[in-house]
Amino acid sequence: MAIKEQILENLGLKDGFFVQYFRWLAHFVTGDFGTSFVSGASVSLLIKERLLNSLILFVCSFVLIALFSFFLGLLSAIYKNKFADIFINFSSFLLASLPHFYIALVLIAIFSVYLNVLPSSGANELGFSGVGAKFIILPTLAIILPHLGANVKFVRDRLNQSLNADFIQTAHARGLGRGKIYLFAIKHASTDIVYYFATLVAGVFAGSYVIESIFSFPGIGKLSLDAVIAKDYPVALATILLTAVFVVFANLLAKIFAILADKRNL
């Protein structure tokens, strides 16, 4: 019992609830998240070691989601009701129906087990040159593919609305070329499309948690889930709260952008 009492005393768990809470809050706002129950290391240091990896994965995934969604949505709108449109819509719907973890396992089975061309785990330190870059390919694909379905459909529908607008019909009547007409339609729909992609920031980042665990990717998501399983409460609390702050901040920025881009939202 003496050892237990000493541990409780060292952790400050014998103080009152409000004393513990405000002490933790004061440390949290200064970047001191405490010490891991499992490893004994500083939680801030554990997060710092993995934050860059998660940011690299997020940036790669988000940029590719935006590019592929816009390109496929534009292609689908240009060839409306033709084979390309039907194929893109069917493929997008199929991908949107599959959960992230299932797609991740399929990618591992194909590229790591059957073809043996990409690693399914083993990443320690990432880099865009050298060996580290190959470890990010499969996790990025596993995040991208499920997001394409709804995104491609949104871009397609929004571009079709623009192409059916009165000013586009006027441009057709005046004999403007197809290229210029599509540029006008893209410009008209750009505010809604950019705002829509801005709202995806939080979902893409938070959705990478499971993917990081499946691929043993050394990021914040894997750190958080491992901490939850091991009941390492300081690490779990810090990573979850940081993710929540990021989600709120990302949504706030998206709304501010929408207000600045379109005064009708005021």
Regions found by a protein language model. Give the residues of each.
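An internal, D/E-rich "acidic patch" concept
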Residues: 13-70
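Short, hydrophobic secondary-structure boundary micro-motifs
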Residues: 19, 34-37, 103-104, 119-121, ...
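Membrane-water interface segments at transmembrane-helix boundaries in multipass membrane proteins
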Residues: 90-152
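Alpha-helical transmembrane segments of integral membrane proteins
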Residues: 47-84, 129-266
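A short secondary-structure junction motif
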Residues: 28-32, 114, 118, 204, ...
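Cytoplasmic-entry segments and transmembrane alpha-helices of multi-pass inner-membrane transporters
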Residues: 71-108, 193
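Alpha-helical transmembrane segments and their lipid-water interface positions
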Residues: 30, 103-104, 254
